[in-house]
From Swiss-Prot:
A Gene Ontology term for the protein's cellular component: Holliday junction resolvase complex
Region (Disordered): 1-27
Enzyme class: hydrolase
Keyword Kinase: no
Organism whose genome encodes this protein: Mycobacterium sp. (strain KMS)
Gene: ruvB
Protein name stated in the entry: Holliday junction branch migration complex subunit RuvB
Reaction(s) the record says it catalyses: ATP + H2O = ADP + phosphate + H(+)
GO molecular function, one term: four-way junction DNA binding
């Protein structure tokens, strides 16, 4: 791969939860060392890998640039890694920015004007791009040109500028937040799914080899099933368990060492951490299992409503612990059982009976 330019890219907001799928402060360099360098090294997402291989090989055989590519899915599944792999597979240079960094059309115009033929432009969080920049992007994606407005008011003129043929790779955790015109301009869209435990075991084995960690097979399985289906979380937990093994044991990670370490870091057997359990406990013990509004629930655990709704709730819903209903959040029978409590009679996997009547 040629030059790598991350002009305009922004760091993730700090998040000190070990089970957060977002990058934590200072984690970028370590995360980069574990990134796969080719589609052959990329673990998981078999359908996406196959589809991407066809798109890229077809473009190389034709001697042209591939269609613009949209990668969607939850954070931590490898969208940035795939963008880097796409550039590497095409033997192209990669330019990296993010939606929030493109506040004005001029910001995008400056970046597009520096592209050379065949470059890959990666825009992370593309759903957060400002509207003026997005509208300029339409023309660049379709016709490889942009119209730059010079001057203001009635005397303003539009100057067309040619843009070198390039491939845009957009990444989003909220594909529904993309406008229709932007979404329609991507020739290929790939949705990335959460990983199965067996796939995460392979991710952990590869990472352990790169980091020189002695990881037992059963220990890898233990970490994998607590990683919330997310490779980034799996790699983070691996490093935390390594710390424990080196400080309190002989450095070899066995299943017992992994369990003991994850207990210290408050990550339980399903991957729930202290905040997740606090939300469930408040929902059940303070509100009888619900229904209760997210704002009220957030006050009960001393967090902002957005933290509960965007950080905790997605995994709790996916794990079958919380149900969203028109009347509020409801604890399922699994949530009661997970906290060691007996569900009330009549409660189901979707919460209390009668909520949808």
């Amino acid at each position: 791969m040629g030059r790598f330019d991350d002009a305009g890219a922004q760091d993730a907001e700090p998040d000190d939860r070990d089970v957060s799928p977002a990058l934590t402060v200072g984690e970028g360099d370590i995360d980069a060392s574990l990134r796969p360098r080719s589609l052959g090294e990329f673990i998981g997402q078999p359908r996406v890998r196959e589809q991407l291989q066809l798109v890229l090989e077809g473009a190389k055989n034709r001697g042209g640039t591939p269609d613009h590519i949209l990668l969607s899915g939850p954070p931590g599944l490898g969208k940035t890694s795939l963008a880097m792999i796409i550039a590497a597979e095409l033997s192209s240079s990669l330019r990296v920015t993010s939606g929030p960094a493109l506040e004005r059309a001029g910001d995008l115009a400056a970046m597009l004007s520096n592209l050379v033929e065949g470059d890959v432009l990666f825009i992370d969080e593309i759903h957060r791009i400002a509207r003026p920049a997005e509208e300029m992007l339409y023309l660049a994606m379709e016709d490889f040109r942009v119209d730059v407005v010079v001057g203001k008011g009635p005397g303003a003129t539009s100057i067309p500028l040619e843009v070198a043929p390039f491939t845009l790779v957009g990444a989003t955790t909220r594909s529904g937040a993309l406008t229709g015109p932007l979404r329609d301009r991507f020739g290929f869209t790939a949705h990335m799914d959460f990983y199965e435990p067996a796939e995460l075991e392979r991710v952990l084995a590869r990472s352990a080899g790169i980091l020189g960690i002695h990881l037992g097979t059963e220990a890898g399985a233990e970490i994998a099933r607590r990683s919330r289906g997310t490779p980034r979380i799996a790699n983070r937990l691996l490093r935390r368990v390594r710390d424990y093994a080196e400080v309190r044991a002989d450095g070899v990670i066995t299943r017992d060492i992994a369990k003991a370490a994850l207990e210290v870091y408050d990550v339980d057997e399903l991957g729930l951490d202290r905040l997740d359990r606090a939300v469930l406990s408040a929902l059940i013990r303070s509100f009888g299992g619900g229904p209760v509004g997210v704002s009220t629930l957030a006050v009960a655990v001393g967090e902002e409503p957005t933290t509960v709704e965007e950080v905790c709730e997605p995994f709790l819903v996916r794990a079958g612990m919380i149900a969203r209903t028109p009347r509020g959040r409801v604890a399922t029978a699994s949530a009661w059982t997970h906290l060691g409590l007996t569900p009330p009679s009549g409660i189901t996997g979707l919460g209390q009976t009668g909520l949808f009547d």
